[in-house]
Amino acid sequence: MKDDSLKSLRENLGKQDQEILRLLNERGRLAIEVGRVKSRKGREVYDPSQEAKVFAKLTGNNTGPLPDQAVRNIFREIISSSRALQTPISVAYLGPEASFTHQAALAHFGLEASFYPKPAMAEIFRDVERDINPWGVVPIENSLEGSVRQTQSQLIATSAGIRAEIFLRITLCLLASHRRAEKIRRIYSHPHALGQCRDWLRKNLPDCRQIETGSTAEAARRVLEDRGGAAVASRIAATTYGLSVLNEGIEDYPENATRFLVIGKGASKPTGDDKTSILFATPHVPGALHQALTPFSKAKVNLLRIESHPMRERIWEYLFFADFEGHAEEKKTAKVLREMNSWTTFLKNLGSYPRGEQS
């Protein structure tokens, strides 16, 4: 390519950059007006259902060469910046900084939100319930290790609801304050992360003691003070805490993802591509669970997941968590819930919300 041709292309790119900048500021002015209207009508600045529709329309109209994920990433920050012009969004998450929950929160809300790490799951729910932070992000299940019981326990009692879901691909690294693997005697991490790379650790560090922590980011912080320790955490945690990456991609299965929930007050509106999560209990008699679930089959509503959870106050009795396709405000779904209620001793709608994008 000739130099003058490259110069011409760069000039055209520069002109497009200026036009994009003009349009972004024009969009910002419109966003401020939208914020004023929302304020007068008492509506939320962050509307998960509306944003899900925006992303679906953008990716549906995308003709390339930008891949859909790139389009989502770009517009995530545009929307995050527009929200910040209206009212700053504050989000509580299971910390510390650089945990996978922090990464999920950033991926969902964008960089212009304000993020507050919490050391315990209960504090996140308490913040949301008391409007200290109106939004929270919590892990609910991993594709390899299953459900996060702490989150399930909080969902039983909370007045907050599920407003959205986030899927995050998990890539695990072995981090240390040095590059000498032979010096490692202890491995720190969250129990789910340790489970996700169980075989790799057994083959490569069989004699190391494994120490459980509250999060992968906490493990990275512990390693700063332990020269004989290593952490199973993310590359972002290595950057945040100034650690070396000794090995990357140590998870036993590459298709490793964690699902997170966005919790908040109120309810998300239908988008046409939604999920609903419920919690229920049945009488302790033969066939009770079958009867409770029969309405799903009759209405041809797809049950995505069901799992039992022990009742703390009643030994050997269980609650059931279930996810299914559809929104509670839709006629067919509402009928299923009404019929199901006849066969349960307890039924709680945890929330209907837009289906998350699986990366």
Whereabouts are the PLM-identified features?
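Domain-level signature for soluble enzymes in the chorismate/prephenate branch of the shikimate pathway
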Residues: 1-359
